[in-house]
Amino acid sequence: MRYSSLLLLLIALPLRAQPERATLEGTVRDVYGTPLAGVNVVLVGTLYGAATDAAGRYLIANIPPGTYTVRASAVGYVPAEQTVTLTPGAHRRLDFALVPTVIEAPEVVVTAARRAQPLEQVPISLSVLSLADVTARGLFTLDDALRYIPGVQMTGNQVNIRGSSGFTYNAGSRVLLLIDGFPMLSPDADGVPFELLPIAQIDRIEVLKGPGSALYGSGALGGVIQVVTRDFPEQPETEVRLSGGAYEPVRHEEWRAHWEGARHWRPFGTAIFTHARRLSDRLGGWIHLTYLRDTGHLNFSERTMLQGYTKLRWQPAAGARVVVLSGLTWRRNDSFLYWNGLRDPLNPGSIPTTGARDAVGANDTQSLQWTLLPAFTHAPGHSFFYTIGGRLYVLALRPLDEQGRPKPLSKGTLGFRYGGQLQLDWQPAEGRYLTFGASADAVATRSSFFPSEDGHPFRSQPEVAVFGQWEEALTARWRLTGGLRFDAYQIRADRWITRLSPRTNVLFQARPGLTLHAAFGLGFRVPGVAERYIENQEFFPIVANPDLRPETSTGYEVGLRYRYRAGLLAELNGTLALFWTDYRDLVEPRFQAERLAFQFVNLTRARIRGLETTLDVRLLGGWLEGMLGYTLLDAKDLTGPEPLPLSFRSRHLLKTSLTMMLPSHLALGADLRVASRPERIDTEFARFVPDAEVTVPVRVLDLRLRWQVSSLTLTFLVKNALDYYYVERPALLAPPRHFQLQLQWHL
Amino acid sequence: MLLAGCDGGLAPPPPSPLAVIEGTVYYNGPWPHPDSVRELRFVAMRFVPQSTQELLLRFNEIERSDTLRRFVDSDTFRVVIDLEGVAADTFRYSGIAWKFGPNPFDWRPLVVYDRPLILRPGERRPIVLEADFRNPASFPGSP
C-alpha cells in the first residue's frame, strides 16, 4: 500500500506545470470531518494520481484537459468517485468525504472467566467498559466507572451487582476486585479500593455477574470486577491528561446557611502523565503518574491523592515472560460518614452518646498503599502454559488529629494482604481447554479498631485453595464448562472453614450471531477481619463477633446474546438474562440491645431473582451509538415469617447512553441512569442519624461534548446536569451538578 | 431525561413551628475529679428512662443541648425543638445528664426537673435547675 502510494506520487510529480495542462487539488476527510492521510486519489483509467498528506490534502498537476472520474480510496473506507471536467489551464478543487466501511470488529476478548476467550463464548453474563468509555466520561476512579455499567448499582462505596451487596456500612464486599487476575480487596475492611488503579493505563473493565466463587473463591459471591491493564506499544507513547472542574453551589438557602463552602464553587482537578515504550527487544513497559485534588461537595470531604504505577514486561526467552505491575498511592482524605439531617445534609452529624468530643460523622485519614503483582508465564509447548504469580498489598493508615497532623500508626491500621498462585492452562485438543491451579493467600492486619488477642496484635486469616475447570466443545454448536474449587480458611488457630464451590455452564450457538447459555454456580464469602473483630466506640458503638459464619449463595441463570448487522446502516448487540440467586447467612449489621451496640451478625436468608437486558446500537457506521441496559430485581428477605423487600435494593435499574458524531470533529454524548427508590432500608441506622430513612429515586443525567483534532482531545462534561439531589446510601448526599473540562494530549 | 426532570430530588423539609427550652443550671458544692465529669448536657426526654440502655434505644426521642461548661458556678443551656405536625409535645423526664466515665454508656442523671414539660409551637419555656454532685439523681428504675 505504501509502495503503491509512493509510486503514484512519483508518477504525479510534475517537472513543471504546463499552461495548457490542468491542476486538481482538494482534501479528503471522513464523514466526521477528520482529515485522512494516505488516501489514494487517482484519475481512473490514467496514471495520474496522488496520496493525501497528514492534513488530508492532495495535489495532482499537469493533467491533460478532459473529463475524468476521480476515485479516492483507503482501507477501512468506502471508495468514493466524482466526475470532473478539466479545461486547459484550469485549477479545480475537489474534496471527498469518505464513509467508514463496517469492518468486522475484532472480537472482544475477556479474561474474567480465568482465561482469555471471545466474549461470545463466555457462558455467563458479562459487561465490558473500555478505556475509551472511561476516558470519554472523564472518569478517574473505579466506582465512578462502574456507575455506567448495566446491572451495577453503587450504594455509597459498595458495589451491587444485580442487588448482591446491599449496604453493610463499608465492611466486607460481596464483589471481588481483580487487577490483571489478582484479587485486590483491601486488607483492613475487605473493601474494594476504588482509587487503586492506573486509570489511563487500563485496557478494559470486565464485570462478571453472578456467583464467581468456583473461579475465584471467597468474595466473588455476587460477581467479579476484573481490571485489565494495558501492555506497552511497539512505538513510544506519551499522554498528558489535565482535568479540572467544580461543584456548583447548592441551590437551597437553608443548606447553604449551615456551611459557607456551599455558597461557592468547589473545585477539583486531576493531572495524569503516562509514558509507554519498548526499552529493548525483550523489555518494555509504562509509567503512570496521577495527582488528584478534590475539595469535595460536602463539608469535610476533601481528598488529595498522589499515585505512581509502573508495569514492566520482560521476555527472557521464547515462550516465557515476566510481568511486574507495581503501584504506590498516597492519599489524604476526609471520609464523610453521615449527615446532620435533611435540614443540614452538607455537614457531618454526631452521636453524642459515644462520648468522644470529636465524634462527628467524618473521619480524616492519611494512607499509604503499595501493591506489587509479579507474574511469570512460560509456555513449554504449543498447547500448554503455566503462570506463577504473587501479590502484595500493604496499607498503612493513620487518622488525623484536629490540626490535620497524622497520629501515630499505632492509632491507625497496618495491613498486609499477600499470596501467590499457580495456574496451568492446557489445550489437549481442539475444542477442549483445561485450567488447573492452586493459590495461597493471607491477610494480616493490626488496627486500633481490632483489639489484640493473646498478645498478637495482627489479626490474620490465611487461606489455601485448589481449582480446576474443564471446557469442552461437544459439537460445533454446544460448549460445556464445568468447574470446581476447594477453599480452606483459617479463622482461628484451631478452626478452619472449608468450602467446595462447583459451577457448570452450557453454551449453545443457535445460529450465527445468536447464542444461548445456562449457568449454575455456588458462591460463598468468608467474613473479613473487620466484620469479625471490629470494636469501636469513637464513631459508632460496634462490637466484635468472631463467630460469624460464611455467607453462601446458589445462583442460576439462563440467557442469550445476539448480534445483528445490516451493512452500513445498523449494528446491534443485545443480551437477555434471567437470574435467580438464593442467599443464606448474609452478614448484616444489627443493633444488639443487650450489647448496646451494633454487631455484624448472620441474619438474612434472601432470594434475588430478576431479568436483565442490554442493547447496544451502532447506526450509520458509528455516526450514532446508543446503549440501553435495564435490570428488574425481585429481592426478598426471607428471614421472617413473611417475605419482605431486601433492604437497599432498587427494583428497577436503567442505564442509557447516547453518542452522536457531529461535524467539525465534535461528538456529543449523554448518559442517564435511573434507579427506583429502595422499597426498604435498614431502619437501625435511623435510630441515631436524623433522616437516615429518607431516600428518593436516583435520576442522574450526564452530558459530554468532545472535540478531537489530531492528537489533542478536549472534553467538556456536565455531571448530574439536572442538579438532582439524591442519596446512594443513607445519610450521604451525592454530588450536585458539576462541570469538568478535560484536555488530553496524546503523543 | 423527562423522568429525570420531574423534580429536583431531596430538599429541606418545610419550615417547622419551633419551641424553645432555655434555662440555667447552678452547681452547688465541690466538683468531682475531672476524670469523673467528662461531659454535661441538658436533655429532655419524651419518656421516663429506666436505665442507660433505654437512652440509646430511644435516642431519637431525646432532645439535647450542646455540651455545658464544667467547673463553673452556673451555665445556661438552650434546646430548640421541632414541633412539625403536632399541637404539643410532652417531655416526661428532663434535666442535666452527667457523663461520669470513659465508656459510651457511662451516663446518669445529675439533676432532674421536677415536672413534665409540655410545649406548644412558638412557646419558650425558661427553667432553672440546681445541681449537686454529692447528691445526684438516679434513674427511676434504679434502687
What are these model-predicted stretches?
Chain A
Residues 182-209:
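Short acidic/polar hinge/loop motifs at secondary-structure boundaries
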Residues 332, 339-346, 444-446, 490, ...:
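Surface-exposed extracellular loop regions of Gram-negative outer-membrane beta-barrel proteins
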Residues 380-401, 509, 517, 549-603, ...:
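Membrane-embedded beta-barrel scaffold of Gram-negative outer-membrane proteins
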Residues 29-34, 39-44, 73-77, 87, ...:
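Short, acidic, small-residue-rich periplasmic hinge/interaction motif at the N-terminus
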Residues 294-309, 313-315, 319-379, 384, ...:
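Flexible loop and strand-edge segments within Gram-negative outer membrane beta-barrel domains
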Residues 126, 143-186:
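Extracytoplasmic beta-strand/coil segments of soluble accessory domains associated
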Residues 186-188, 201-203, 214-226, 231-308, ...:
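Outer-membrane beta-barrel translocator/receptor signature
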Residues 475-480, 573-582, 601-683, 742-744:
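Gram-negative outer-membrane beta-barrel transporters
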